[in-house]
Curated annotation (Swiss-Prot):
One of its GO terms (cellular component) is cytosol. Pfam families: Trans_reg_C. This is Uncharacterized protein YgeH. NCBIfam families: PRK11906.1. Disulfide bonds: none annotated. The lineage of its organism: Bacteria, Pseudomonadati, Pseudomonadota, Gammaproteobacteria, Enterobacterales. GO terms for biological process: phosphorelay signal transduction system; regulation of DNA-templated transcription. Keywords: DNA-binding, TPR repeat, Transcription, Transcription regulation. One of its GO terms (molecular function) is DNA binding. Residues 4-103 bind DNA. The gene is ygeH. Gene3D superfamilies: Tetratricopeptide repeat domain, Winged helix-like DNA-binding domain superfamily/Winged helix DNA-binding domain. TPR repeats lie at residues 372-405. It comes from the Bacteria.
Length: 458
């Protein structure tokens, strides 16, 4: 059979068949031989209808004369393959006529690098809530996006993605079908409200385009958020790291792994881990030619300097100056994302520029980036300004989103030690005694920031 066009078939039970003859279910793959594949494709093209034996033979064997036994052997082989993966009785024999594929199947194209269209895959959301089926939300979101009929945007059906629930199966899908974008998400309960946290990712180099969190019953807003960010990337390609060279895909993936390792060290929030994070970020910005990654490294290095100052490992004024010098590297960039704005809000806030900090934080919120970090930065600035209740609210929100980030846990413990003074005197606030030397150092250094001469950004 002539297989000129790239395509794939998707079955409701999570099976996927590609034109190379690979049948996939989750992490399992089975190869279908060429003749059997030809027979199967003829049946799939007429799924639900009877296909005459002579028509199958003519389509697969073309001008070669073969007996019915050759077709019978192919049908038997196909049935054995499907039965092995638990998908039996899908090929029916219609007495004295032919065969029929009785399962429901969807046919999709495989996105080619040279096409002007763009495609998106929505992977299954994860949740620990027993009262919610995330696949229902996935299906609704797929339907909403596809029903909007955005010119040039192809949405993969749930039949293609509903078994892509881990990194192995997702990476397999990405490498075989090559969508332009994909969406991942998780559902958590936040103050008794079921909230969907999503990330829109450029599939070519695994770079985060945008993230957001919305109540699960606001899927129309979620779909519009996804579409808007895709359209901005398509119509303003300078926003997208897809401009990175195609042959650097593996290198970019490796650099992204290094970035994640550096962030993990920073999140651990010990002096030793922060020094390790600085080494990683400095090495990354020196060897990467991706401007967005270099910019993020500068901003994270700025946060590292301020974090070391809070631990008493460097002078606060010197740390603030170094942080601001690093931000000078990104000040000329015309398009900045929420991560950059949020870190700039932190540095300016801890440098005494409250109004500038507030504006930057508000802009970061609009650009919808790492919300947990945004709340963490705002908590530090509120703590610095002795707005303890506001700091407590922000750090609690940060921990609700990312409970495993130790830096937020430490600041939460510090904030909880800082309480109103019950005595009627000029000292409105004081902090309780603590056995933790590191906590005392952090609190003391946050208070010392108030004594610094205001440092202005150049």
């Amino acid at each position: 059979m002539d297989l000129e066009n790239k395509f794939s078939y998707h079955f409701l039970e999570g099976l996927t068949l590609t034109e190379d003859g690979i049948l996939t279910q989750g992490n399992e793959q089975v190869y279908i031989p060429q003749k059997e594949l030809g027979v199967l494709i003829v049946l799939l093209e007429s799924a639900g209808h009877v296909v005459l034996k002579d028509m199958i033979i003519e389509s697969v064997w073309k001008n070669i004369i073969v007996s019915d036994e050759s077709l019978t052997r192919c049908i038997y082989s196909l049935r054995c393959i499907f039965e092995k993966i638990g998908y039996d009785r899908c090929i029916e024999t219609i007495y004295r006529k032919g065969y029929r594929f009785s399962g429901q199947v969807f046919k999709t194209k495989i996105n080619e690098d040279n096409t002007s269209d763009y495609s998106i895959a929505i992977f299954p959301f994860t949740t620990s809530l027993n009262t919610l089926d995330p696949l229902i939300l996935n299906q609704e979101l797929v339907q909403i996006i596809s029903n909007k009929k955005i010119d040039g945007l192809y949405t993969y059906p749930m039949a293609a993605t509903n078994f892509c629930n881990d990194h192995i199966s997702q990476n397999s899908f990405l490498s075989r079908f090559k969508p332009d974008y994909f969406v991942t998400g998780r559902i958590n309960q936040n103050n008794a409200v079921n909230t969907l946290y999503i990330e829109l990712i450029d599939a070519k180099n695994l770079f985060l385009i945008a993230s957001n969190h919305l109540p699960v019953d606001e899927l129309h807003n979620t779909s519009q958020f996804i579409i808007d960010n895709i359209l901005q990337t398509v119509h303003k390609p300078e926003r997208s790291v897809r401009l990175a060279k195609q042959d650097q895909g593996y290198k970019n993936h490796y650099l992204s792994d290094e970035m994640l390792a550096g962030k993990k060290e920073l999140y651990d929030f010990t002096p030793e881990s922060i020094y390790r994070a600085m080494t990683i970020f400095d090495r990354l910005q020196n060897k990467s030619d991706i401007q967005t990654l270099k910019t993020e490294c500068y901003c994270l290095l700025a946060e590292c300097h301020m974090s070391l100052a809070l631990h008493g490992k460097s002078e606060l004024e010197l740390a603030a100056q170094k942080a601001l010098e690093l931000l000078d590297y990104v000040s000329d960039i015309t398009t900045v994302d929420g991560k950059i704005l949020a870190i700039m809000g932190l540095i300016t806030g801890l440098s005494g520029q409250a109004k500038v900090s507030h504006i930057l934080f508000e802009q970061a919120k609009i650009h919808s980036t790492d919300i947990a970090s945004l709340y963490y930065y705002r908590a530090l600035v509120h703590f610095h300004n002795e707005k303890i209740e506001e700091a407590r609210i922000c750090i609690d929100k940060s921990l609700q989103l990312e409970p495993r980030r130790r830096k937020a846990v430490v600041i939460k413990e510090c904030v909880d030690m800082y309480v109103p003074n019950p005595l009627k005197n000029n000292i409105k606030l004081y902090y309780k005694e603590t056995e933790s030397e590191s906590h005392r150092v952090i609190i003391d250094n946050i208070l010392k920031l108030k004594q610094l001469t205001r440092i202005c950004m150049r």
